[in-house]
Every structure is written in C-alpha cells, then in structure tokens.
C-alpha cells in the first residue's frame, strides 16, 4: 500500500509538519499587528493571540464626543483582529502547502 519505506517517510513528513506548525504558532502568538480607524486617528496594536499591546488616540479626538471615540477604538481593534486572522491564514498556508483547514476549525491559539 505505501511501498518501500513509504509509511516511514509519511510519518517523518507528518512530524516535520507538526514541528513547523508549532514554530509557526509561537511566531504568530508573538507577532504584533496594528489596526486603524478614523483614517489612522485611532490605532490598536494587538499580538497574534489577540492581547492588546497599545491603544494610540490622536490628540485631536480627545475633545470630541465620547461615543464616537468608543466606536473608533472598537473599529480599530476589529481591524487589527481581522489582520491577525489574515496573517494566520497566509502563514498556515505556507506550512500546509495551501491545504485549508475545514470550515469552522481554527488554529489552536
């Protein structure tokens, strides 16, 4: 079924892929991504594991209404989270050779 050494090679390839994926998970968890809203007036920087590192608010917004500022912060965070997801997909595709995860299945972090 697997031919000469086929099963051994298959197991070795699976182990190598698992090691690459573990390294990738660590790399993604430590990366920082910045999302923006209000044409860059609000910036939120998060890690690959979605921990907020920084929130930068342009001084000009400090006198505007509170509700608008809250909306801009939420939008900037959502933009950063979307960017993390895109980066995860791109990096995962490079490890899996473009093989996609089943719908609804996410990386374990």
Swiss-Prot record:
Compartments, record wording: Cytoplasm, Nucleoid
Region (Disordered): 1-22, 88-109
Protein biosynthesis listed as a keyword: no
CC per GO annotation: bacterial nucleoid; cytosol
Family annotation (InterPro entries): YbaB-like_sf (IPR036894), YbaB/EbfC (IPR004401)
UniProt GO MF annotations: DNA binding
Biological function: Binds to DNA and alters its conformation. May be involved in regulation of gene expression, nucleoid organization and DNA protection.
Subunit structure of this chain's protein: Homodimer.
Protein name: Nucleoid-associated protein VP2178
């Amino acid at each position: 079924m697997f031919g000469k050494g086929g099963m051994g090679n298959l197991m070795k390839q699976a182990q190598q892929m698992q090691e690459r994926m573990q390294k990738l998970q660590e790399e993604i968890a430590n990366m920082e991504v910045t999302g923006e809203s209000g044409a860059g007036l609000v910036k939120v920087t998060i890690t690959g594991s979605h921990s907020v590192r920084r929130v930068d608010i342009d001084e000009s917004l400090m006198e505007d209404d509170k509700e608008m500022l809250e909306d801009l912060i939420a939008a900037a965070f959502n933009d950063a989270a979307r960017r993390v997801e895109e980066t995860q997909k791109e990096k995962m595709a490079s490890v899996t050779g473009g093989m996609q995860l089943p719908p609804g299945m996410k990386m374990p972090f």
